[in-house]
Amino acid sequence: MMAGEGSTITSRIKNLLRSPSIKLRRSKAGNRREDLSSKVTLEKVLGVTVSGGRGLACDPRSGLVAYSAGCVVVLFNPRKHKQHHILNSSRKTITALAFSPDGKYLVTGESGHMPAVRVWDVAERSQVAELQEHKYGVACVAFSPSAKYIVSVGYQHDMIVNVWAWKKNIVVASNKVSSRVTAVSFSEDCSYFVTAGNRHIKFWYLDDSKTSKVNATVPLLGRSGLLGELRNNLFTDVACGRGEKADSTFCITSSGLLCEFSDRRLLDKWVELRTTVAHCISVTQEYIFCGCADGTVRLFNPSNLHFLSTLPRPHALGTDIASITEASRLFSGGVNARYPDTIALTFDPTNQWLSCVYNDHSIYVWDVRDPKKVGKVYSALYHSSCVWSVEVYPEIKDSHQACLPPSSFITCSSDNTIRLWNTESSGVHGSTLHRNILSNDLIKIIYVDGNTQALLDTELPGGDKADGSLMDPRVGIRSVCISPNGQHLASGDRMGTLRIHELQSLSEMLKVEAHDSEILCLEYSKPDTGLKLLASASRDRLIHVLDAGREYSLQQTLDEHSSSITAVKFAASDGQVRMISCGADKSIYFRTAQKSGEGVQFTRTHHVVRKTTLYDMDVEPSWKYTAIGCQDRNIRIFNISSGKQKKLFKGSQGEDGTLIKVQTDPSGIYIATSCSDKNLSIFDFSSGECVATMFGHSEIVTGMKFSNDCKHLISVSGDSCIFVWRLSSEMTISMRQRLAELRQRQRGIKQQGPTSPQRASGAKQHHAPVVPPSGPALSSDSDKEGEDEGTEEEELPALPILSKSTKKELASGSSPALLRSLSHWEMSRAQETMEYLDPAPVANTGPKRRGRWAQPGVELSVRSMLDLRQIETLAPSPRGPSQDSLAVSPAGPGKHGPQGPELSCVSQNERAPRLQTSQPCSCPHIIQLLSQEEGVFAQDLEPAPIEDGIVYPEPSDSPTMDTSAFQVQAPTGGSLGRMYPGSRGSEKHSPDSACSVDYSSSRLSSPEHPNEDSESTEPLSVDGISSDLEEPAEGDEDEEEEGGTGLCGLQEGGPHTPDQEQFLKQHFETLANGTAPGGPARVLERTESQSISSRFLLQVQTSPLREPSLSSSGLALTSRPDQVSQVSGEQLKGSGATPPGAPPEMEPSSGNSGPKQVAPVLLTRRHNNLDNSWASKKMAATRPLAGLQKAQSVHSLVPQDEVPSSRPLLFQEAETQGSLGSLPQAGGCSSQPHSYQNHTTSSMAKLARSISVGENPGLATEPQAPVPIRISPFNKLALPSRAHLVLDIPKPLPDRPTLTTFSPVSKGLAHNETEQSGPLVSLGKAHTTVEKHSCLGEGTTHKSRTECQAYPGPNHPCAQQLPVNNLLQGPESLQPLSPEKTRNPVESSRPGVALSQDSELALSLQQCEQLVAELQGNVRQAVELYRAVTSYKTPSAEQSHITRLLRDTFSSVRQELEVLAGAVLSSPGGSPGAVGAEQTQALLEQYSELLLRAVERRMERRL
């Protein structure tokens, strides 16, 4: 009975699952997913991820070039400049690809675990076949000449060679290899194919008669090539001969040899390529192309290997592409110019074009019909490393004030460049940016320094591994932001340096080291706020607020977050200016601006804490709500005025990962999200419904922006690629309709009453939201977690800005900000429906509509059923509110650019076809109507000498080389004869031969049976995970490509295993603790480069209290490029009067009992990174502080010692009297209350947990008697510094390190540096009042900081203390001291401090240990620097000078130590104590000996 019931239940369940309703639901779900992915299409890819010749291919019939870009295959037509795309649905990176001989199909290999070999229909761009027989990545693939078979070779830990009959979907032959394989090539007659790799040339033979009859996998027969003298080489690429040389096989070695093998697998001859390294090869019947280092491509004759010519090299690294407007400048490089390496080649036999990819991620297509006259058909330059941020150039009301053409956007990258792009109007640039002939999409490259090494992808084969390993991984630009008026570009790098560029001249107008760590977010305030502020947020948990209207003077520094700050935004809500910030401490702070003197101060009004890390934030255009992307993949929406959470919905379709970025569109209808699973999604902001999904990036998407015309979404990623997505016509029309209705409402409000000109002009430039077509209102109780999830503090009421314009607006009651207070989901649906259905009043109200919305709304609704591209032909392109349609007469001639004459309908229509032909990816039938604004940017330049679109160099510029330099060599007699015994020897099985493998039932020896291989080959990894931990089986495997993780996930021939895709994930993980991953093994790397503010963290390590907040100041940072001082390597030599352990930059001024005035000046970052000699000192352990400072302004900058200078001051101090009235005096001992400067909720929770487990006990102690902590040199080095960017989401967030409790202080000044480089200063925070507690003793006597120690050295904070009233002096008091006053670094006095010159200066054991640790760190840094500069094959003049300087220093140190042998080392401040002197001397002698040995070994190797 029971059995019967069970069977009945089972049958019922089966029937239920088979029911039509279930199938219908499944089909609907599948259709739903398909609809979501079809809403947004990939229109253009700006980037390339080709890692070798296997990632580039050409259709021999049509000339179509295919290359990999993340998870996308780009099919590019060089003649038409058109792109089509194949998206890999598995979300795995494309590593190898090849065309079929007829060009109809494309085969791709991918990386990751259990990769697939896929065959795609090129015309349909759809998958037709799939093979999953590899486990650890596919290294290379190839079609047979008959297109019947496909051969695929796995990566190092896969070791499988498969021959696949892809139409039958069976593997006909297979075998294993014991070496890393880098390339594969089929013979012309399809009888064999050849693989090349590390000490590996292998010929694999196919018996078509046998393989066609057997349906099971048969052993693949292989024979090794006889390498002879070249047996220890790495063969990077191989190609079988064609035509008369079909029996030959050509390959190249990484050492720069071109080799030819005969049909007997015998090394016949070779020729040197005269290059340092060779990467790729392409063979035709007429030519052999060899891609080499420094952009070199050599041409040889395949019949005899005679040298023919060398192709022109591409652009030199660091080239200003905006200046390359003529063909004569294209091929002209400087004497010391450096070029990228050629890493991939493919030849188009139809057009005789050669496509090349270089390791700076640039693509060139050369016309090689005549080798003596090579022309450039096409070129493009892309980012070579992780792209961190993207910003869209704003719409400017007055087009004549615009610095960039419409539809431009800006990106920044780890390659240390900021790039300006314009894909819409290629060739139509601004007055200062003429069209260039290097790239159709790239307008300008801003190089932040002269380090060209950062421009190369060092993880590619073309990268120099030695140089790449010594490169600081923290270089690069992390964030960018454009001012609302389009005039300034702010950028923050990964070292904490803030730069401001003028976009009109593209010159650097300001450079200041604002933070101790990377700047994660920059934000300008919108014009509607009535303020011109710039907020800078960093990993060092500080926010600096600068006044852009007052030459970027520092207004305030906010110190409320307890961990990295991930986002900061401005908003105008309820007549108040707000600042919202969120961070990895799970806190959200809402602040309100308050007028203070001549500046603005932000005070906290709400503080909300959630249970998950907050990674990004955006404010919707109504400025009433802010959306925050969280670690749990939810989007939380908060009311800006109240700080209450109003809504929560899922921000990702997947079940893994975390939200990294969120971005609202200009109308506020949609919000786009980026998840760490590499997917993009677009949601309806009001309902939370997903409306579109996208994929294609192979790394985390680090930035997104909607275009101003609502047609595109631009995404940037860690894979170095930029994707331009085309939104569906329905989405675009709905967004444009909302913007049109908003402008009409604003126009109606302006007619009812006067408005402040400042606010009114700002409202015109900013898109405010309107009602969406549908969607419920947000409910305040929709959060599943509830409001009790976090704590909320309402400490201060909202404080209005008491400016005149604000008072007028509040009095009139007609401010546009009042309209913004209505969010688009809170407007009446009935009213919205009436406006949508009856747009006639919209079109007839007020003056005639102009600009982008010249078309009435009813016409938009009719056109909504058409393709969006057809709408473009009927309406002007929406460039900005000031744009006029063709029916509007243009402005007067005085307002025009270089064109001068007015643009009529006829003239624009005549110019439209010419513009269209220069636009890539535009449909050929579209006629782009030029608006008046576009006419401003049109440049009637003389065309470059182009023949059929090909740029040819002048004859003198064509590089030539003597053919006698390339001598063909053959093996010596008998050297191969002994190895090649004839026919008998040829029958001997090679180590990789299938005969050495025991097959059972004609099946391949699988990785599950590794012992079946009789030879000692490297076993396969069978655990299903990346085998990075496996030890290589052979000694030469140290060249494996999977040893490191690249910045963008690009490995030299290595797969993208899950372990190797962790770079960006790890970056975001460490946002919570502000430390770098790695541990002690990477201490040296972390301490090599520190920001200047890190040094002054040592000055506050003994401070028991934080100082109260100070008001704003008028310090103007007005540095120009000609005033920016650069410091050479010679300026790093310390002064002879510097006491032991004191870096040169911490020298005190002379002992003058009177008060001193100082001159803060701008301190620039040195491009050569030679300020690392005190890196170990910068990492000194710090004492826990007993208070947390919540806000601090510029007046808390520590006054620096006066220095002689011949340059004018870059900082001027003004208007400080009224803002410092409440400051305590310098010598005062009273303690002021800290108002709201208490622990944050998040920090208090962490503090309680730390105390409970015994961590950071100093934070819980009373501030009156902090206990001194002994610091060992090893602890100093182990402290965290700057961080990589890593994200391991499941891990709990660690407690905040002690180092993050200190506020960054002003950077120090080197005495000898300032003498040579002029005045220097930095932007930071410091203490301006003295402490009232003892630093070393346990007594309670109130003393100043300088009295705390018996020997306050120059590196101690006491030595840098100045009274606050000194800052109140006028500019006339800020004069540099004479050199006589700074002679004695020991003599120093401060107000309230009596320091005797004859005081006993005892050198304790602790100070001795500290000195030894610093000495060891300095020596280590010097050795590392010496290795770095001597590793360059062609050092520059500066590097040679550095080398000589270091050698001389080493020699002088050795001589001094020899002279002092047996003597006691003395201290400049007095005789040392008996304890520790002998140990110090012994350590010095031992370490000096080790240093000399290392230098000698290095010199011997170099010689």
Curated annotation (Swiss-Prot):
Compositional bias of type Acidic residues: which residue ranges? 784-796, 1028-1043
In the record for this protein, the WD repeats are positioned at 89-130, 133-174, 176-214, 271-310, 337-376, 382-431, 472-511, 514-556, 560-601, 609-648, 654-693, 696-735
Tissue spec. comment: Ubiquitously expressed. Highest expression observed in brain.
**Region of interest (Disordered), residue spans:** 745-817, 874-917, 951-1176, 1217-1238, 1369-1391
Record's Gene3D superfamilies? YVTN repeat-like/Quinoprotein amine dehydrogenase
Phosphoserine sites (modified residues): 1193
Entry's Gene Ontology BP terms: negative regulation of canonical NF-kappaB signal transduction; negative regulation of defense response to bacterium; negative regulation of interleukin-8 production; positive regulation of JNK cascade
Biased composition regions of type Polar residues, renumbered to the chain = 905-917, 957-972, 1089-1129
Question: Keywords assigned by UniProt?
Answer: Cytoplasm, Cytoskeleton, Nucleus, Phosphoprotein, Repeat, WD repeat
Cysteine disulfide links: none
One Pfam family per UniProt: WDR62-MABP1_CC
Comp. bias (Basic and acidic residues) = 1058-1068
What the entry says about domains is: The N-terminal WD40 domain is necessary for the interaction with NOD2 and down-regulation of NOD2 function.
Q: What does this gene product do?
A: Negative regulator of NOD2 function. It down-regulates NOD2-induced processes such as activation of NF-kappa-B signaling, IL8 secretion and antibacterial response. Involved in JNK signaling pathway.
Question: What protein is this chain from?
Answer: Mitogen-activated protein kinase-binding protein 1
Q: Which gene encodes it?
A: Mapkbp1
